[in-house]
Amino acid sequence: MKEILRRALTGVLYVIILLSAVFLNSDAFDFLFMVFGLACLYEFKRLTHLKGYYIFIAYLGLWWAYIYLVSDTTLITLLMLLTITINLALLAFLFSKKETPFNTVQKFIIGLFYIGGGCIFLTMIPYKHNGFSKFLIMGIFIIIWVSDTFAYFVGKSIGKTKLYPSVSPKKTIEGSIGGLVFALIAAYFLSLIHI
């Protein structure tokens, strides 16, 4: 019960902060996701024991350049390819038997493109047709929240088969399927609304 209450309160706070930023103005939204990126990098740095603050400087420089300066689709595509490549490499590493630790340069590159690249493209999502689409980004987050919420409740109620115990001991296959199904339902209803 305490865990559900904690999750609910955290979720409500998160929703309030996000809604405030989205509906205040585009600059507030940009700033919020820049800060989210810094927070994620701080946690990544702590978990991987990456020393120094160069990664924060590199992230801020990359974020600023791509959000406010770069408009060339070739450069944007290049960053996207780098980000996707790092994601696929991490996925392959996750399912491999290797236990070779990452060196400092690898940690830096992973943090910059896995986290930094992800935050940059997340920040870009609502900017379509030279405008700021509040409801597009809200629709995406609604789908994420629905998926997360129902994955939790389905997993708690009928979940038996562990998904990946060494990474997340409590997550189950049943919960993941439940989250996916309800996310698709939410996406369908949101598709009926023009955003």
Give the positions of each predicted feature.
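Membrane-embedded alpha-helical bundles of polytopic integral membrane proteins
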Residues: 1-172, 176-192
